[in-house]
Amino acid sequence: MSGVLIAVAALLALAAVFGAVLGFASEKFKVEGDPIVDQIDSLLPQTQCGQCGHPGCRPYAEAIAEGEEHNRCPPGGQDTVVALSELLGREELTLDDEGAEDANVAKVAYIREDECIGCTKCIQACPVDAIVGAAKLMHTVIVDECTGCDLCVEPCPVDCIDMLEVKPTLQTWGWQRPAGIGERPDSRIEVVNL
């Protein structure tokens, strides 16, 4: 019995020593991140869609901090460009929507379920997990979660995914802003449902 207690005590002592060494090392060799990158990253929509030319929002935030243009995020829209301009103290640019069909039109993925073969490639491609389904079963899109990044369209082997325009509803409709208040004339005023 005493042999077991000695082994347990030795393991506890080793765990305490290694824990202390790791704790000390984590404080001593801590690498400070650039706080501006964190602030930029928090303003980006986190869709990880790659439409900006970077593999995700964090690499794009790092590129912006190093001087790259801050107007290449179609999912974020013009509001994100304005917020980034204010944060960085840079000139306000217009959204560079090259590569995006129409950044001002909200789109959502739609899977024609009768044609879906259940390969799960669209599920793997979706950066926000807006597609549900299982292998060899049909898939469907959770419309409220879909960001319209269209990353699911290309991997589909049977081409059963379409990007459809989101039609205004009573919940999403808004008045056009009057021209001259610092916004584009076609931007909408947010409607708050009480």
From Swiss-Prot:
<keyword id="KW-0479">Metal-binding</keyword>
<feature type="domain" description="4Fe-4S ferredoxin-type 1">
    <location>
        <begin position="107"/>
        <end position="136"/>
    </location>
</feature>
<feature type="binding site">
    <location>
        <position position="156"/>
    </location>
    <ligand>
        <name>[4Fe-4S] cluster 2</name>
    </ligand>
</feature>
<dbReference type="GO" id="GO:0051539">
    <property type="term" value="F:4 iron, 4 sulfur cluster binding"/>
</dbReference>
<comment type="function">
    <text>Part of a membrane-bound complex that couples electron transfer with translocation of ions across the membrane.</text>
</comment>
<dbReference type="InterPro" id="IPR016463">
    <property type="entry name" value="RnfB/RsxB_Proteobac"/>
</dbReference>
<feature type="binding site">
    <location>
        <position position="52"/>
    </location>
    <ligand>
        <name>[4Fe-4S] cluster 1</name>
    </ligand>
</feature>
<keyword id="KW-0408">Iron</keyword>
<feature type="binding site">
    <location>
        <position position="57"/>
    </location>
    <ligand>
        <name>[4Fe-4S] cluster 1</name>
    </ligand>
</feature>
<dbReference type="InterPro" id="IPR017896">
    <property type="entry name" value="4Fe4S_Fe-S-bd"/>
</dbReference>
<dbReference type="InterPro" id="IPR007202">
    <property type="entry name" value="4Fe-4S_dom"/>
</dbReference>
<dbReference type="InterPro" id="IPR050294">
    <property type="entry name" value="RnfB_subfamily"/>
</dbReference>
<feature type="domain" description="4Fe-4S ferredoxin-type 2">
    <location>
        <begin position="137"/>
        <end position="166"/>
    </location>
</feature>
<feature type="domain" description="4Fe-4S">
    <location>
        <begin position="32"/>
        <end position="90"/>
    </location>
</feature>
<keyword id="KW-0997">Cell inner membrane</keyword>
<feature type="region of interest" description="Hydrophobic">
    <location>
        <begin position="1"/>
        <end position="26"/>
    </location>
</feature>
<dbReference type="InterPro" id="IPR010207">
    <property type="entry name" value="Elect_transpt_cplx_RnfB/RsxB"/>
</dbReference>
<feature type="binding site">
    <location>
        <position position="122"/>
    </location>
    <ligand>
        <name>[4Fe-4S] cluster 2</name>
    </ligand>
</feature>
<dbReference type="GO" id="GO:0046872">
    <property type="term" value="F:metal ion binding"/>
</dbReference>
<keyword id="KW-0004">4Fe-4S</keyword>
<keyword id="KW-0411">Iron-sulfur</keyword>
<dbReference type="GO" id="GO:0022900">
    <property type="term" value="P:electron transport chain"/>
</dbReference>
<comment type="similarity">
    <text>Belongs to the 4Fe4S bacterial-type ferredoxin family. RnfB subfamily.</text>
</comment>
<feature type="binding site">
    <location>
        <position position="49"/>
    </location>
    <ligand>
        <name>[4Fe-4S] cluster 1</name>
    </ligand>
</feature>
<feature type="binding site">
    <location>
        <position position="73"/>
    </location>
    <ligand>
        <name>[4Fe-4S] cluster 1</name>
    </ligand>
</feature>
<feature type="binding site">
    <location>
        <position position="149"/>
    </location>
    <ligand>
        <name>[4Fe-4S] cluster 3</name>
    </ligand>
</feature>
<dbReference type="GO" id="GO:0005886">
    <property type="term" value="C:plasma membrane"/>
</dbReference>
<keyword id="KW-0472">Membrane</keyword>
<protein>
    <recommendedName>
        <fullName>Ion-translocating oxidoreductase complex subunit B</fullName>
        <ecNumber>7.-.-.-</ecNumber>
    </recommendedName>
</protein>
<feature type="binding site">
    <location>
        <position position="152"/>
    </location>
    <ligand>
        <name>[4Fe-4S] cluster 3</name>
    </ligand>
</feature>
<feature type="binding site">
    <location>
        <position position="126"/>
    </location>
    <ligand>
        <name>[4Fe-4S] cluster 3</name>
    </ligand>
</feature>
<keyword id="KW-1278">Translocase</keyword>
<feature type="binding site">
    <location>
        <position position="116"/>
    </location>
    <ligand>
        <name>[4Fe-4S] cluster 2</name>
    </ligand>
</feature>
<dbReference type="InterPro" id="IPR017900">
    <property type="entry name" value="4Fe4S_Fe_S_CS"/>
</dbReference>
<dbReference type="Pfam" id="PF04060">
    <property type="entry name" value="FeS"/>
</dbReference>
<feature type="binding site">
    <location>
        <position position="146"/>
    </location>
    <ligand>
        <name>[4Fe-4S] cluster 3</name>
    </ligand>
</feature>
<keyword id="KW-0813">Transport</keyword>
<feature type="binding site">
    <location>
        <position position="119"/>
    </location>
    <ligand>
        <name>[4Fe-4S] cluster 2</name>
    </ligand>
</feature>
<comment type="subunit">
    <text>The complex is composed of six subunits: RnfA, RnfB, RnfC, RnfD, RnfE and RnfG.</text>
</comment>
<keyword id="KW-0249">Electron transport</keyword>
<keyword id="KW-0677">Repeat</keyword>
<keyword id="KW-1003">Cell membrane</keyword>
